[in-house]
Amino acid sequence: MADIDGVTGSAGLQPGPSEETDEELTARFERDAIPLLDQLYGGALRMTRNPADAEDLLQETMVKAYAGFRSFRHGTNLKAWLYRILTNTYINSYRKKQRQPAEYPTEQITDWQLASNAEHSSTGLRSAEVEALEALPDTEIKEALQALPEEFRMAVYYADVEGFPYKEIAEIMDTPIGTVMSRLHRGRRQLRGLLADVARDRGFARGEQAHEGVSS
């Protein structure tokens, strides 16, 4: 079977039922994969930072996903499998040629839930100053996230926006779990510093409290 951007042989893939017709395959894809389009577009937009590139990336991802869908094992994590294809397609096709980030309305990015989801693991961002950051508009959080190095940005995105556990992030990013944990820790630390600066500038944080935990 052809390599679907590095996902062949990974968890979730095995020879599919040979008796499945093309019509049945299409129906299964539409039933299981299409409902995840909005979430995948959010991931594509985080990667490319440009709506036109995000749409192109999503389209290419879904074409590849459909091509390999007959071998996807029903009952395993389809979302993680699709994100793996999305990530590898971005790395292989878009990272080197992507357009410059464009200005676009904040409502196009509605999936950012870092403040409310930061507690999902023991290394989450929850702290006194982060409580105040919940008052920040999404555009400030978006800009802070985009300021992170790519490998940190994507680790934070997958963990705190999409809610993937370490193991699945490691599969998506094709990197060891220890590396994922390190990138996530460092990314969250940098993001907390960036957001604390914004909060202090906007008057949300008070004096020395805003510096606790972010000055080192």
Curated annotation (Swiss-Prot):
Lineage: superkingdom: Bacteria
Question: By its UniProt entry, which Gene3D superfamilies does this protein fall under?
Answer: 1.10.1740.10, Winged helix-like DNA-binding domain superfamily/Winged helix DNA-binding domain
Q: Which GO terms describe its cellular component?
A: peptidoglycan-based cell wall
Pfam families membership: Sigma70_r2 (PF04542), Sigma70_r4_2 (PF08281)
Q: Where is this region: Sigma-70 factor domain-4?
A: 140-191
Q: Which UniProt keywords apply?
A: DNA-binding, Phosphoprotein, Sigma factor, Stress response, Transcription, Transcription regulation
Region span, Sigma-70 factor domain-2: 37-99
Q: Where are the transmembrane segments?
A: none
What happens on changing residue 106 to A? No in vitro phosphorylation by PknB
Relate the induction remark in this record: Poorly expressed in exponential phase; induced by heat shock (20-fold, 45 degrees Celsius). Induced 10-fold by the thiol-oxidative agent diamide within 30 minutes of exposure, by 2 hours expression is again normal. Autoregulates its own expression, part of the sigH-rshA operon.
Q: What happens when the gene is disrupted?
A: Increased susceptibility to oxidative stress (H(2)O(2), cumene hydroperoxide and diamide, PubMed:12123450) and heat shock (45 and 52 degrees Celsius). Loss of stress-induced expression of a number of genes including clpB, dnaK, sigE and trxB, sigB and itself. No effect on infection of human derived macrophages, and murine J774.1 activated and unactivated macrophages.
Say yes or no: keyword Transcription present: yes
Report motif location: Polymerase core binding. Answer: 56-59
Q: List the residue ranges of the region (Disordered).
A: 1-24
Does the UniProt entry include the keyword Transcription? yes
What InterPro entries does UniProt report for this protein, alphabetically?
RNA_pol_sigma-70-like, RNA_pol_sigma-70_dom, RNA_pol_sigma70_actinobac, RNA_pol_sigma70_ECF_CS, RNA_pol_sigma70_r2, RNA_pol_sigma70_r4_t2, RNA_pol_sigma_r2, RNA_pol_sigma_r3/r4-like
Q: What else is known?
A: Was identified as a high-confidence drug target.
Q: What do we know about how this protein assembles, alone or with others?
A: Interacts transiently with the RNA polymerase catalytic core formed by RpoA, RpoB, RpoC and RpoZ (2 alpha, 1 beta, 1 beta' and 1 omega subunit) to form the RNA polymerase holoenzyme that can initiate transcription. Interacts (affinity=15 nM) 1:1 (via sigma-70 factor domain-4) with RshA under reducing conditions; the complex is disrupted as temperatures rise. Phosphorylation of RshA decreases its interaction with SigH, leading to increased SigH-mediated transcription.
Question: What is this protein for, i.e. what is its function?
Answer: Sigma factors are initiation factors that promote the attachment of RNA polymerase to specific initiation sites and are then released. Extracytoplasmic function (ECF) sigma factors are held in an inactive form by a cognate anti-sigma factor (RshA) until released. This sigma factor is involved in heat shock and oxidative stress responses; it positively regulates the expression of itself, sigE, sigB and a number of transcriptional regulators as well as other effectors of heat and oxidative stress, leading to direct and indirect control of up to 25% of the bacterial genome.
This protein is called: ECF RNA polymerase sigma factor SigH
Give the species.
Mycobacterium tuberculosis (strain ATCC 25618 / H37Rv)
GN (gene name): sigH
